[in-house]
Amino acid sequence: MELWKKSLKELSDLVKSKEVKPSEIVEAFIERKNQVEPKIKAYVTALDDLALEKAKKRDQELTKLENIPDLFGLPIAIKDNISTKDIKTTCSSKMLENFVPVYDATVIERLKSQGYVITGKTNLDEFAMGSSTENSAFFPTRNPWDLERVPGGSSGGSAAVVASGMAPASLGSDTGGSIRQPAAFCGVVGLKPTYGRVSRYGLVAFASSLDQIGPFGRTVEDVAMIMNVISGKDPKDSTSRSIPVPNYLESLNKDVKGLKIGLPKEFYTEDLNPQIKEIILNAVKQLEKEGMTAHEISLPYTKYAIETYYIIAPSEASSNLARFDGVRYGYRAKEYKNLEEMYSKTRDEGFGAEVKRRIMIGTYALSSGYYDAYYLKAQKVRTLIYQDYMNAFEKVDVIITPTTPDVAFKIGEKSNDPIQMYLSDIFTVSANMATVPALSIPCGFKDNLPVGMQIIGKPFDEETILQVAYKFQSLNDYHKRFPEV
């Protein structure tokens, strides 16, 4: 039995039936990691010894437990912008290269309460700014399906560990597509929950009105299992909402017959790669055979989503990243003559090029002469995008689009052209703007590379998108395919 090929749900069942010990599972994933990690480089910090130690502890606890939690003893990887107590949290930046938090993020506390085992901290674009994980200050992560290509970003490490079988599941964060785009590029399932569904406490902030933590898994069940644990109100995060959390796992089997799918014409234009379009529409046809109906809809203001996003997100980032000044924690420049020089040198040496670019864009958009023309206007357009989605959801239950305009691109292909890089999030950013939940699920291959289908739902209705994704998964075997690394 190759344990590293099992899904999180399958591993959970094996632990609950006591057929397999947590330590055996963790050992299998460490062995797999030792084989493929040198080629992929998905971990900033691998925690093999700690994981084994925790797993052996779980072995002993298992003998005494009557009610075994779903994630008990299961290995999960964590994106390195989520605070883990006593474990380095670098945000893949020189600025936080040696930063060790003194507290856990709420999502980590919730996973710990289930008895999960952390496998390590995964690589990302520095401070989650990027779409390829090439902006990591340490090294780029490679796509397990083709080592010459990017895994997507910013949660590229989290997607790559799951795709390559180094961990059965992981956590990422999504500000403009940072869970869904890498999930699509790596051929795994990734969910960005509704804004406010999962606590952001302990997530290093990039754009506070857009960021959300979410899970990656091999299957829809895996993602549902993690959502059951991490969702819900948190007194430490005032933006988290006290809307009841359903049992996502138990409701997966609900019949999707009669549900209406919206296909936004703005997403299926001439610019969309014809092969991608065909793969997505074939997937929709499969769902129609199951009793769902497809309808063309319009989301007129989404065509301004990228421009709006690249004003709002950098503006919030310029404010959030002001705290990294060399005074309290993180990197501090070695030589400086006065306080002002310490600030400027620390930030110049500590931040990478893309982070500096976004801080400058954001500072410009917020500056007194331009605030109304840029930031205020962008907020108004954001409201119109939100309204587009709300109008559409009066007519349909879910919206289906491609997750990305094309499959994973080559490493270095877009790094000198920020606009091209930004456009790889063209289909994902509007869901963040509208705060709605959205999931990417593998739905085919183009040139032997995975293609992702995005399923977008009503606010706080992750349940329906998971049900539609689960139905689609049951008709296909994409979740059972592994890259040859």
From Swiss-Prot:
Keywords: ATP-binding, Ligase, Nucleotide-binding, Protein biosynthesis. Heterotrimer of A, B and C subunits. Pfam families: Amidase (PF01425). Signal peptide: none annotated. Allows the formation of correctly charged Gln-tRNA(Gln) through the transamidation of misacylated Glu-tRNA(Gln) in organisms which lack glutaminyl-tRNA synthetase. The reaction takes place in the presence of glutamine and ATP through an activated gamma-phospho-Glu-tRNA(Gln). The keyword Iron does not apply. GO terms for cellular component: glutamyl-tRNA(Gln) amidotransferase complex. GO terms for molecular function: ATP binding; glutaminyl-tRNA synthase (glutamine-hydrolyzing) activity. HAMAP family: GatA. InterPro entries: Amidase, Amidase_CS, Amidase_dom, AS_sf, GatA. It catalyses: L-glutamyl-tRNA(Gln) + L-glutamine + ATP + H2O = L-glutaminyl-tRNA(Gln) + L-glutamate + ADP + phosphate + H(+). GO terms for biological process: translation. This is Glutamyl-tRNA(Gln) amidotransferase subunit A. It comes from the Bacteria. It comes from Sulfurihydrogenibium sp. (strain YO3AOP1). It is an enzyme of class 6 (ligase). Belongs to the amidase family. GatA subfamily. The active site is at 79 (charge relay system), 154 (charge relay system), 178 (acyl-ester intermediate). Its EC number is 6.3.5.7.
